[in-house]
């Protein structure tokens, strides 16, 4: 049975102009007519206080009223966020989520208002896109025959496509064993080490962390594909290309976040024991959490394991089936009914997870972890527009700025939002 993970509903490159007053009176009101009842239930589920979104000085307040969700002109309560029209348009079209705008430094207002803004974001999507919040029992994990899915399965490239395709589409992740040779891994290790040595804190192309002993080190090299000839060769290797062909969605080597479509991207991650500061490990998140889900998902994020993935080296946990659920941060904090799979991989294995699968990395306890993340993007739709040079530069700056604003990013990811 063919399984698809292409859940796109919106073309990239739509008209960038969104007039706030016309939006609230027009598109918003129309969407409320279609999805408002369930979206109001979502807002009540999250226990959301009123939030005022002020766009270039013009305020509208979101709240749950007696008749459901309301967007009223004016200010109500203390929680006010400020956006310009470009940021508001990005929010409406889901080019950026509330979290993505906060991380990019494009939201005015106080910190608590930022948290409430992020908390309202899933309800905005519930209204505008009909993506309602997950309820217990809505996602099941089954084999093609209807039996419970064994989440500890491992696959090889010569197993054929049917079994890994079903598992990946059902669970949102997969583990492929023995993909690359020791010689190839040694070459990648050497090129990653050279990139780490060349990195500087202000280079705009790396994230930095610190250990309890005070050592600062580059924990993520953002432009590794440009610094690693060996990696570029492997990304054109039939073994790697076969991973993108497991599903029938036409995935091709490219940015797994979707933002750069067919541009090859790769990041080298280094996680040292005792890291206590920085973004060496990310808490529970979806790769599309900063925006673009309705335009790009699901891409395939590929992790080339240069060290084992285990308790000693640090792990990778995935909430199985979470790519098929719209999940708010407050639901994550309260606990989900979906099982958590803890991946155990060896050097040379490859992890695969979908861009909208909820996952986290855990700190190493006794040995350094090294991994290279790259991936596959869905092919552009007929109405899509590739990012131009200015967009490309902005995307790179925003990606680099995540670490520069790590306190805000971690707060938004870890606290109820």
Regions from the PLM with identified roles:
Residues 242, 249-252, 275-344, 383-388:
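Catalytic core of non-heme Fe(II) oxygenases with the double-stranded beta-helix
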Residues 63-64, 74, 294-296, 364-367:
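Short glycine/proline-enriched turns and hinge-like loops at secondary-structure junctions
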Residues 67-70, 189-193, 318-320:
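Short Gly/aromatic-enriched secondary-structure transition segments
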Residues 145-170, 177-282:
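Non-heme Fe(II)-dependent double-stranded beta-helix
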Residues 1-159:
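Feature captures hydrophobic
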Residues 2, 323-417:
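Conserved double-stranded beta-helix
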Residues 89, 289-290, 356-360:
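Histidine-centered metal-chelating micro-motifs
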Residues 108-109, 175, 352:
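Hydrophobic beta-strand signal
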